[in-house]
Design a protein with these regions (language model features):
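A recurrent flexible, glycine/aromatic-enriched loop bordering the glycosyltransferase active site
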Residues: 95-113, 156-159, 182-189
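Conserved nucleotide-sugar donor-binding
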Residues: 33-34, 106-122
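Hydrophobic targeting segments
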Residues: 1-11
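Short aromatic/hydrophobic "clamp" motif used to bind/position activated sugar donors
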Residues: 37
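Acidic donor-binding/catalytic loop of UDP-sugar-dependent glycosyltransferases
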Residues: 42-56
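Glycine-rich, basic loop-to-helix element that forms the pyrophosphate-binding segment
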Residues: 15-32
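Membrane-embedded multi-pass helical conduit in multi-pass membrane proteins
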Residues: 192-256
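Catalytic donor/gating beta->alpha subdomain of glycosyltransferases that bind UDP-sugars
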Residues: 63-90, 120, 125-188
Length: 257
């Protein structure tokens, strides 16, 4: 498979010509000679450096969503790290489940494979004027064009990402994510976002809603990351409505993403 893939790792300030990550991706992918490109963030940790061909079957797929897991570098993660790990597990499992059913609502450019020509055709849809969000806008573009999107659950291809260690960095990232929401047009993404927003507003109005929400959330979390404790997941469930609304309002009113 390696002769069909080019690994693309954009680095800020190195190959972006001062124009941001999306321009760096465009330059690197344009220069690639293979049918597929494997996009990776420069700070991910791959489980294995040797990928067997049978573990990575991409033929016939235009976009392959690869798995991610969040792990702390610390033996005893901080409260902030524990909450991020629980949230990330839920997000990743939701990504997998919706993609398997043909209604993908999320993907991450930290670990993603795309057909080179399809990516280049979709570049104008990535909103180059917005510094981030290349992965989600790419997903929307591929879905709109009716291209084939698949998901891989192989442990061998799972990449590890690190949680933020400061509250400032955490909030900045969440507000960037929320700030892109008005640009989304895909009906699956909008429906999923509306359901999540409604459920959390209802929980704020009536805390007993957590009794209905939490079993589903905890199932998603444990299915993706069995190491997440009940206490971490429950704390996340309790504070999530407030946290989500702060991030959403803050993101929508930020002048810069």
């Amino acid at each position: 498979m390696h002769d069909q893939l080019t690994i693309i790792v954009p680095r800020r300030g190195i190959n972006d010509e001062g124009k941001g990550k999306k321009h760096a991706l465009y330059c690197l992918i344009s220069a690639a000679k293979t049918e597929y490109v494997w996009m990776q963030d420069d700070d991910i940790i791959l489980q294995s450096l040797e990928v067997k061909g049978e573990s990575l079957e991409v033929k016939g797929t235009d976009l392959l969503i690869l798995p991610l897991r969040m792990q702390s570098e610390n033996e005893k993660p901080s409260l902030l790290e524990l909450l991020q790990i629980a949230e990330y597990a839920a997000i990743q499992q939701l990504t997998i489940e919706t993609a398997k059913r043909g209604h993908a609502v999320m993907c991450s450019g930290a670990n993603l494979i795309a057909r080179r020509d399809r990516w280049l055709e979709s570049y104008p849809d990535l909103h180059p004027e917005i510094p981030s969000g290349d992965d989600m806008f790419l997903l929307e573009s591929f879905k709109r064009r009716g291209l084939k999107i698949d998901v891989c659950e192989s442990e061998q291809l799972t990449a590890v990402v690190r949680p933020h260690t400061s509250w400032r960095a955490f909030w900045q990232q969440r507000m960037r994510w929320a700030g892109k929401a008005p640009k989304y047009t895909d009906k699956d993404i909008l429906l999923c976002g509306a359901i999540v927003l409604l459920a959390n507003v209802l929980q704020l109005l009536c805390p007993l809603v957590l009794l209905v929400k939490f079993p589903l959330e905890y199932t998603l979390i444990k299915k993706r990351d069995a190491s997440v404790s009940l206490s971490s997941a429950l704390l996340l469930g309790l504070i999530y409505p407030i946290y989500m609304l702060i991030a959403l309002v803050g993101g929508l009113f930020r002048r810069q993403w």
